[in-house]
Amino acid sequence: MESKPLVTVITPTYNREQFLRQAIDSVLAQTMFDFELIVVDDGSTDNSWETLAEYKVKDNRIRTFWQPNQGQSVARNHALAEARGDYICFLDSDNYWPVDKLQQQLTVLEKNPTVDVVYGDIITIDKDGSETSRNNMTRYSGPIAKWMLRDNCVSMNTAIARRKCFDQMGGMSGQRRVADDYDLWLKFSASYQFLYVPAFWAYYRVMDDQISSDKTARFDSNEAIIHSFRKSYPNAVSAAEFNAGFAIFYVRKARYLASVGRKKEAFRVFFKALGYRPFGISVWRGIAAVTLR
């Protein structure tokens, strides 16, 4: 009987042939060997599937699946249904890991048995792999739901979670092509303990043509996600913390809209923020900053 791996690494891919080898190689190079790598090809039209076939022959820890194009949320759920590990983590096919990522995280989890999700920081790189930033956002530990309502502080490619989280609360919603990672970690934050470790655990590739379009779509998706979260988990935080989180989210969205020249929309979003926190200093500061710009 084939032994069960300790860790399952999940990689969805769609037309990322040029980066796929680097992602897979970074998993195979890990200093911790007890893992399986499940790659789901989401209907690629390049040579990704042929590349996967090469790797599968070389290493029996690699398992590959193909599906018609349905988005990475569905691809991740496909992999989750096949996963056998006690721990689950994700690596997108255009990103990669440092060689000791898994070993470091398993050591942290062993020392912290009450922690369910461990995550860290990213190094942002461009299409060619050159580093562009290490200026990471503020991240949090413990019950982090109130912080997650304001913004997603958990970087998908750096995180590792105990399998019980998925068994008890499920995987991706499968409803969105954008921000399925936020949906997952926000949901988990209603019940589980997170631990942030200030270590760079993933190289995250950002394409020039993705930045503005992805950010607009992500704000729209995140807005739907936080409202759905409040309906599904009304006791995750207090009413005051929900309102504060919503207000700060809307301030962030409004400031972004103003920064790309959509000032009228920005003011409409500021009014939404005022509805949740009419006397919030951050709301009024945001309004003043946009008005005077």
Description of each model-found segment:
Residues 81, 120, 134-222, 261:
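Conserved nucleotide-sugar donor-binding catalytic segment
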Residues 206-293:
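C-terminal subregions of glycosyltransferases and related glycan-biosynthesis enzymes
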Residues 1-28:
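N-proximal low-complexity "stem/linker" segments adjacent to membrane-targeting elements
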Residues 4-7, 28-39, 47, 60-63:
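Short loop->beta transition adjacent to catalytic acidic/histidine clusters or analogous donor-positioning motifs
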Residues 67-83, 104:
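Glycine-rich, basic loop-to-helix element that forms the pyrophosphate-binding segment
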Residues 100-132:
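Conserved donor NDP-sugar-binding/catalytic core segment of glycosyltransferases
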Residues 88:
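Short aromatic/hydrophobic "clamp" motif used to bind/position activated sugar donors
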Residues 26, 41-50, 70, 92:
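A conserved acidic beta->alpha catalytic loop
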